[in-house]
């Protein structure tokens, strides 16, 4: 028994000594990234007055200048959004101001880096959340000008939503060659402000409900109702996942809802719409979902 103990101890020490470090932490001085999404309480704005106070901000990674190096965009809640240009060698430069992306008195939640207009350059779509108010309350679309600057054009593209947006997923749901948008919105009402009754999820809400926006020659039209997407204000959406669930080569949609509402699974009907069928696919579902992923 003593010999066995010595052998096991030797093996443990050998494994410990040969274990390689997989990651190395870089300081802000090394990387140039000093973003800090600092939150401050006020009597008017705190976790009790705003249920998503601690939900955080999104991060987008993409190559904005096609130099082969991924750049980083950070969403700020009570601080400005930040865009960092990858200079190579894990060195980044803050180009937020010169890029025209400084933000003030807005609550940014999610970000998507995607080529909206098909010009080969990544654009930036920022979802706004937090307490409604202010003249910059709507979501913002920053079109890449090709010179490390961006122009806000959400109105021109029909993407200036003013709900409590959490995130946006861009994908070609109708396979017509352009990107459409599933906009994930959080409810504008308090959690305790509902009386759950039958078919309440079938009652659309213009601000609190999710939206499916179809890209029609560069303008995003709201087709939520006609394609079978729930747009009620009982869905506290925190995650949207796109994938081909039934392997028919058509994109399907999974929506993760926080609090009491169940999740949604939309199967693409191959005719321009969706069927919500989660109860046929999943027998048991958790409450308070905050995200999902597809994998084999």
Where are these regions (language model features)?
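Sec-dependent signal peptide recognition
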Residues: 1-8
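Acidic, glycine/proline-rich Ca2+-coordinating loop motifs
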Residues: 15-296
